Amino acid sequence: MAAATMALSSSTFAGKAVKNLSSSSEVQGDARVSMRKTAATKKVGSPWYGPDRVKYLGPFSGESPSYLTGEFPGDYGWDTAGLSADPETFAKNRELEVIHGRWAMLGALGCVFPELLARNGVKFGEAVWFKKGSQIFSEGGLQYLGNPSLVHAQSILAIWACQVVLMGAVEGYRVAGGPLGEVVDPLYPGGSFDPLGLADDAEAFAELKVKEIKNGRLAMFSMFGFFVQAIVTGKGPLENLADHLADPVNNNAWAFATNFVPGK
């Protein structure tokens, strides 16, 4: 009865007669009606969206800012620096984060996978990600997957031109539309372009957006770590991992940070 009384006294029911509330079956008593409606609301709710979403406010934030309402995926209510206070800046940064997260996920896979295959007997010529590009300046040029019968690149200018044309076309279609029709949302599949049907189920699609942004953020941190490893150790991520597992005392971030001398 206490729960029912609270539900009836909330702003949701203010100024409304209880008898007007819809129900799938005949009920008796105000308490039962209010409890059914409350349960339905919780059932369709998501832990990742809305005011009751999962939050991380950090050590310097007492409460979530008013402009972070949980409308977008990845909003944990934390913005100590006020980066999202301006709506236009927030929209721009949100797009940049999603796009960079996707590239980082592809990049992290591209850094690890060739090295993994090379360590299992597959010949790549050069499997370490930050050394691979320099092969284009070698006599034999850069061979895709180490196979001369595939893409055989010998001109860095030609690669640059292909990248500009292909990536520019894809980005142009993403923002302004293309042969498939107008763009519904420049950030996510849907409308004329959704070959996998990801947007067919709205609830599942909303959850996929959260998974994407979380994995994208992790991938961006991973890529930053790969860059630091390349500068400090001159090795790929899997080789660094193998060295750490073989000798964790001498091969770790603290050991390298205290002994690292730039240029040596």
Curated annotation (Swiss-Prot):
Chlorophyll a 6 binds at H244, A253. Belongs to the light-harvesting chlorophyll a/b-binding (LHC) protein family. Chlorophyll a 2 binds at H100. Chlorophyll b 2 binds at R102, V151, L180. GO terms for biological process: photosynthesis, light harvesting. It comes from the Eukaryota. Chlorophyll b 1 binds at Y56. Photoregulated by reversible phosphorylation of its threonine residues. The modification Phosphothreonine is found at T38. Keywords: Acetylation, Chlorophyll, Chloroplast, Chromophore, Magnesium, Membrane, Metal-binding, Phosphoprotein, Photosynthesis, Photosystem I, Photosystem II, Plastid, Thylakoid, Transit peptide, Transmembrane, Transmembrane helix. The chain crosses the membrane at residues 98-118, 150-170, 218-238. Residues 1-35 form a transit peptide. This is Chlorophyll a-b binding protein 2, chloroplastic. Gene3D superfamilies: Chlorophyll a/b binding protein domain. It comes from Hordeum vulgare (Barley). Chlorophyll a 4 binds at N215. The modification N2-acetylarginine is found at R36. Pfam families: Chloroa_b-bind.
